[in-house]
Amino acid sequence: MYSNKPSRKPHTFQFRGKQLQASDSLFFIIALLCLLPIISSPVALILGFTLASFGFVPTKLNIAAATKKLLAYSIIGLGFGIHLDQAIAASTQGFGLIVGSIFFTLIFGWFLTKALRLDQKTGHLIASGTAICGGSAIAAVAPAINARDDQTSLALATVFVLNSIALFIFPAIGHLLEMSQHAFGTWAAIAIHDTSSVVGAAGAYGDEALRTATTIKLARALWIVPIAFLSALLFKGDNKKIGIPYFILFYCLAIVFAHFVPSLESIYSHIFVASKRLLVVCLFLIGSGITIQKLRAAGLKPLLLGVLLWVAIGVGSLSYILLNVA
């Protein structure tokens, strides 16, 4: 016997003119929670990946376009947290080692990407993250080369895995080799991807190591600007015009503005903190663009590339530092 009762339609709601399912609200709730300090960058990426794998990501929203805009805003905001005088001073410390390690990593990464037959943009993002400052570099370079969310997610996942490992093994290696505070701080700043892991590893080693690592890491992070422009040039394809990442220009302007208008320091600090949280939201959105099926399709090549680059820069910089840095 068939029932004459009408079937219950799923609850829906409107968002910017789009008809969304009530189940999609979980996606927005977690996105908002990413603004709180209780969720770290790796956790945000994993949450996005988990929702995507279980089909809880709204399909009617252009999440990729929103992510690109939010990434630009967050990178610009981070510029207000960098002091120009500190940036200039940091650039003079270990300049040769910083420049050499960055370009070695990018060039070696290019050859390895070719050898492994890995997607060019994914390989370049992993190399950029290894060469400069992990997730922040990947977030800045990705829109400059018009990388897809799955390419960005694979690069971020690779870097975050290696970051977690570095946090534990670097201090152990430093103590085993009886490295000085200054030498270890230099090594951590050169060979560890993300600033958070650099600070964590160096802080565990000692106060002097932390000061050295923070200063050199800042100088390394400043290379986000030229590398983003270089990346846009390399991946312009058949287009005659280069896709200039204008947010990088505003990032530089934010640094300069904060320097010449110091009276607004309290506001800058709030903008900087808010931008860091917005970056976490972006990582959640990026994670929502990749599923288990996409990871299986990519295979182990992205992780293998990340490990090979990391070992090369880690061993190479360690050898140089042990021979030349007191």
From Swiss-Prot:
Membrane topology: Multi-pass membrane protein
TM region(s), chain numbering: 27-49, 70-89, 94-116, 123-145, 155-177, 184-206, 216-235, 242-261, 271-290, 303-325
InterPro entries xrefs: UPF0324_pro
Protein name: UPF0324 membrane protein PBPRB0970
Localization annotation: Cell membrane
Keywords, ordered alphabetically: Cell membrane, Membrane, Transmembrane, Transmembrane helix
Family statement drawn from the similarity comment of this UniProt entry: Belongs to the UPF0324 family.
GO CC annotation: plasma membrane
